[in-house]
């Protein structure tokens, strides 16, 4: 209709709240009412009185309908969040940051840092757990020191952060790591490797935190929360110890992770911990690009070939740079590798690529496109990693444009059943200002070629 709705366009600002994240917090009581098709009392936040009684399924359906239409609201599971809370004696967790990965005390903050997982993939195809542990140790130490020199927007935020010293180490490029390892994102092998790496990261972080506590003391709020903090550490450790490996690749990482959790509990029992929280999985949308990552956070690749809208008009074609590495891992020759990459760049997908075996198709499945990962594939990946995080996971469960409201409702329900703390959904093309897509839609001004 003549409106300029591109990113940075003069008319896009008329569509308010397009760049805001809105979530609804639900309790176990509400979810059980949904399961049993019962009524639920909506409670006033200040007084605690029931102000309206509604049909739980009707309200849940309205949430799904809204998310179908515009990708909001996301959902947060209150009881799960607070069951993994290390500081309940200080206060409950009432809210999160906008992306829903940092969940802690009111008036607190958390510095974030992320590791590029693909950098730890060795030439023989194994994951370099030894150097990963060293990197986590270094970053956790540096992040804790940074709190001493940080400025905060308000005095209460500064006071709470210095007293509880929450940290948020995480990672990016998981999707690329799995692809380069010849593992499908939506596979038991992919999920178990992701879970093992996440467990290793958080176990190492808390072990280092306990060591720091022995030198400079535990966080100020530890004494009153010692029992709860220790309980949560044991929950993490037990989840790691009970994990079942699928491949030799994840088995090796689980072994190192479990040793880290054992040391974490042993040292923490003596010293306490320096930090109330240690890990989250953030979106890494900006820093992931700066680290030359193909995939952000815990996400799979959006598409093998994608188009990023540019502020001011036009778009940039981005071809996944991990494809050649994955094909080499799978045993394809250089000549076949080059032909497949060229086919993908021209066609945007791998179907009928010359020389590519159909049994390898799922390794290249992405969030969007002809061969897209199912919604539950996203949710199961989150569930594989959530038990090994202090905070939550900022992740989008991508659905095709023809997805139904019922499918979104199922995603929200299964997220609760699988023990997630939060999740968000995005149905393709449900927003007018969509920065990434798997189709051009605008003249290409620049091309990022795949590395050969």
Give residue ranges: language-model regions.
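Beta-sheet entry/capping signal
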Residues: 65, 72-75, 109, 164-169, ...
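Catalytic alpha/beta core of large soluble enzyme barrels
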Residues: 101-103, 143, 147-148, 214, ...
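Active-site cavity-forming subdomains of large catalytic enzyme subunits
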Residues: 1-135, 145-162, 183, 192-194, ...
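Ferredoxin-type iron-sulfur electron-transfer modules in oxidoreductases and energy-metabolism complexes
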Residues: 189
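Catalytic-loop motifs flanking and including active-site residues across diverse enzymes
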Residues: 108-111, 167-173, 201, 319, ...
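Core structural elements
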Residues: 140-146, 160-182, 283, 350
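Short, positively charged, Gly/Tyr-enriched micro-motifs
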Residues: 186
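Extended, hydrophobic alpha-helical segments in both membrane/secreted and soluble proteins
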Residues: 171-176, 205-209, 323, 393, ...
């Amino acid at each position: 209709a003549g409106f300029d709705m591109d990113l940075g366009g003069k008319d896009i600002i008329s569509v308010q709240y397009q760049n805001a994240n809105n979530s609804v917090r639900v309790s176990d009581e509400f979810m059980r009412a949904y399961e049993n098709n019962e009524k639920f009392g909506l409670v006033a936040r200040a007084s605690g009185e029931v102000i309206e009684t509604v049909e739980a399924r009707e309200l849940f359906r309205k949430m799904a309908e809204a998310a179908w239409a515009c990708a909001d609201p996301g959902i947060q599971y209150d009881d799960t969040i607070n069951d993994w809370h290390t500081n309940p004696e200080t206060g409950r967790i009432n809210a999160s940051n906008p992306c829903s990965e940092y969940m802690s005390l009111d008036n607190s903050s958390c510095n974030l840092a992320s590791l590029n997982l693909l950098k730890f993939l060795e030439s023989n195809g194994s994951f370099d757990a030894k150097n990963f542990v060293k990197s986590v140790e270094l970053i956790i130490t540096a992040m804790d020191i940074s709190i001493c020199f940080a400025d905060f927007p308000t005095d209460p935020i500064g006071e709470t952060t210095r007293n509880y010293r929450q940290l948020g180490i995480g990672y990016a490029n998981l999707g690329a790591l799995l692809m380069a390892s010849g593992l499908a994102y939506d596979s038991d092998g992919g999920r178990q490797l992701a879970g093992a790496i996440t467990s290793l990261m958080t176990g190492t972080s808390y072990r280092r935190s306990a060591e720091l506590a022995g030198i400079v003391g535990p966080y100020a709020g530890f004494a009153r929360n010692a029992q709860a903090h220790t309980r949560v550490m044991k929950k993490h450790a037990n989840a790691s110890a009970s994990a079942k490996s699928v491949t030799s690749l994840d088995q090796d990482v689980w072994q190192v992770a479990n040793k880290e959790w054992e040391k974490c509990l042993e040292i923490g029992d003596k010293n306490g911990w320096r930090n109330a929280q240690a890990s989250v999985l953030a979106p890494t949308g900006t820093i992931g690009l700066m680290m030359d990552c193909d995939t952000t956070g815990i996400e799979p690749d959006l598409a093998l070939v994608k188009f990023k809208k540019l502020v001011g008009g036009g778009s940039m074609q981005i071809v996944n740079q991990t494809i050649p590495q994955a094909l080499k891992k799978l045993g394809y020759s250089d000549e076949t590798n080059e032909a497949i990459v060229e086919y993908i760049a021209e066609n945007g997908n791998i179907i009928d690529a010359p020389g590519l075996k159909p049994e390898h198709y799922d390794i290249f499945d992405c969030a969007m496109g002809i061969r897209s990962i199912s919604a539950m594939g996203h949710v199961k990946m989150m569930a594989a990693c959530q038990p090994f995080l202090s905070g939550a996971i900022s992740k989008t469960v991508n659905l095709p444009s023809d997805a139904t409201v019922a499918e979104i409702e199922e995603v929200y329900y299964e997220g609760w059943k699988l023990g997630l703390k939060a999740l968000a959904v995005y149905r393709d093309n449900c927003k007018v200002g969509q920065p990434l897509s798997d189709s051009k839609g605008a003249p290409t001004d620049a091309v990022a070629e795949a590395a050969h």
